[in-house]
Amino acid sequence: MSILLKGGTVVSAYNRRQLDIRIDGEQIVEMGANLPVENSQIEDVTGCYVLPGFIDAHTHLELNNGKGSLSTADNFTTGSQAAVAKGTTTVIDMATPNKGGSLKDCLATWNQLAEGKSSCDYTYHMSMIEWKPTIAAEIQEMIAAGITSFKMYMAYDNLRTTDAEIFEAMKEIKKVNGMLGVHCENGDLVDELIQSYVSQGKLTPHYHPLSRPAAVEAEAVARYLMIAEMADLSVNIVHLSTKRSLEAVERARQRGQSVYVETCPQYLLLDDHLY
């Protein structure tokens, strides 16, 4: 028996319309005004907006900080429940291997974390926290397993790779038409600024944004995009947070590069005057 949503306002990227929607299994099979109700489970959604399920393309569920002392607040059970409650029907989690571990083992670990526990659809971006021939050889395996996007870091000592390694990874990812997203910060400068404030005993939240000024992100974004231009790869920038970084993206697009960008609500609503 199909499910018939009646009386709702369907919102798309183009317009809003009063339409009925028929769902069979997990597919929308028909949309139109006053669809027949025979052999249907009717759900009256009059007065409601009907939208496609949202996709949260950047989650960290049950992620350990790599030092064994701290994990993110949500796991696949609680995180997916929170997602569904607000209309998100797919999450793309950041699968992150241990140092020295394989991508294949990481994928198996994340499947074990998620299987039978998630209330919504899920998939992963595969993080590559080091670069070596065995990792390069696994990229094709990840594509075959349905993982088409990868992540690397320019910051955090336990996660970051060098510019040369990012360049080599880009060339391998291009071979399989994959996508690379990178956490863009100048890790050396961040570490130096943090150490400078710590040595002065300046440990309050006020100094957190001072240790990560806009320039350290903008510089890394510009550098990343130059590397991507050399590799001729379409790329993504994760959680972009500053105007100067966006200006670097706009310059790259004017040069003809294909660049995708994500941001987060906190970067749109909060700034450092709060600290």
Task: Please state what every model-predicted region is.
Residues 1-53, 67:
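Histidine-rich, glycine-flanked metal-binding segment
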Residues 8, 26, 47, 58, ...:
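Divalent metal-coordination and catalytic microenvironments
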Residues 48-117, 134:
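Metal-associated gating/positioning segment near the N- to mid-region
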Residues 87-92, 118-123, 147-149, 227-234:
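Short, surface-exposed connector motifs at secondary-structure boundaries
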Residues 104-120, 168-182:
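Alpha-helix-loop-beta-strand connector modules within alpha/beta enzyme cores
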Residues 128-133:
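Active-site beta->alpha loop and helix N-cap motifs at the rims of alpha/beta catalytic domains
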Residues 134-275:
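Histidine/acidic residue-rich metal-binding segments in metalloenzymes
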